[in-house]
Amino acid sequence: MEKRGGGSSGGSGSSAEAEVRKGPWTMEEDLILINYIANHGDGVWNSLAKSAGLKRTGKSCRLRWLNYLRPDVRRGNITPEEQLIIMELHAKWGNRWSKIAKHLPGRTDNEIKNFWRTRIQKYIKQSDVTTTSSVGSHHSSEINDQAASTSSHNVFCTQDQAMETYSPTPTSYQHTNMEFNYGNYSAAAVTATVDYPVPMTVDDQTGENYWGMDDIWSSMHLLNGN
């Protein structure tokens, strides 16, 4: 009997753990969390999750609220002006996303980090490969032309003259603060290229559902019987 009782206790614990939901949040869960915080405020997140009737961890509730559901979280595409600020501050501070987010009201550090990695950084890497290949081909052509010219006209260049015809291969993304330039990539060129719409349904990195606020508030009225 004692042995069976011990097994029952373990099974209960496993059952409780299995009830914790993982994966993307549903709109129903979002509405429950928004409604609860609107009426009771936030607080100890583990207690809040249980009190609200959500089968989520306190950490999951906290991150969902802070990164997606807070009323002051700014929605919609990152603007060209915001892109310039992100590039300027990243050139100064690197991957200090929380510090950068303080200069972009309504944007979260997670959103800025995802935008940087999936938009700006991706563009810089792709451009670097293209530019390096193009410049390398151009230099090879110059060298061949110079060799042919020297052979035909019996012209001998001094070492100093040869150095003057050589320009080093550009490097991408150097931490400079000159007119927002990243090595050979101006902010204007990058922002013009990476002005893609930010998904309003699924987050690129986390896979979380991302609702429009109009959808959420219209559903809130239905939930509250208004």
From Swiss-Prot:
Induction: Up-regulated by jasmonate. CDD domains: SANT. Signal peptide: none annotated. Mainly expressed in floral tissues. expressed in all four whorls of the flower, in the anther vascular tissue and in cells at the junction between anther and stamen filaments. Detected in the nectaries and ovules. SUPFAM superfamilies: Homeodomain-like. It is found in: Nucleus. GO terms for cellular component: nucleus. Residues 1-13 have a biased composition (Gly residues). Pfam families: Myb_DNA-binding. GO terms for molecular function: DNA-binding transcription factor activity; promoter-specific chromatin binding; sequence-specific DNA binding. InterPro entries: EOBI/EOBII-like_plant, Homeodomain-like_sf, Myb_dom, SANT/Myb. PROSITE patterns: HTH_MYB. GO terms for biological process: gibberellic acid mediated signaling pathway; jasmonic acid mediated signaling pathway; red, far-red light phototransduction; response to jasmonic acid; stamen development; stamen filament development. Keywords: Activator, DNA-binding, Nucleus, Phytochrome signaling pathway, Repeat, Transcription, Transcription regulation, Ubl conjugation. Residues 45-69, 97-120 bind DNA. Disruption phenotype: Short anther filaments, delayed anther dehiscence and greatly reduced male fertility. Myb21 and myb24 double mutant is more severely sterile than myb21 mutant and has petals that just grew out of the sepals but ended at a lower level than the stigma. Myb21 and myb57 double mutant has an intermediate sterility phenotype and petals that grew to a final height parallel to the pistil. Myb21, myb24 and myb57 triple mutant has a strongly reduced fertility and an arrested growth of the petals that never grew out of the sepals. SMART domains: SANT (SM00717). Transmembrane segments: none annotated. Its main location: nucleus. Probably ubiquitinated by COP1. Ubiquitination takes place in darkness and leads to its subsequent degradation, thereby preventing to activate photomorphogenesis signals. Residues 1-20 are annotated as: Disordered. Interacts (via N-terminus) with TIFY10A/JAZ1, TIFY5A/JAZ8 AND TIFY3A/JAZ11. Transcription factor involved in photomorphogenesis in the light. May act downstream of the light receptor network and directly affects transcription of light-induced genes. In darkness, its probable degradation prevent the activation of light-induced genes. Required to activate expression of PAL. Acts redundantly with MYB24 and MYB57 to control stamen filament elongation in the late developed flowers. Contributes with MYB24 to induction of MYB108 by jasmonate. Repressed at the transcript levels by DELLA proteins. This is Transcription factor MYB21. It comes from Arabidopsis thaliana. The lineage of its organism: Eukaryota, Viridiplantae, Streptophyta, Embryophyta, Tracheophyta.
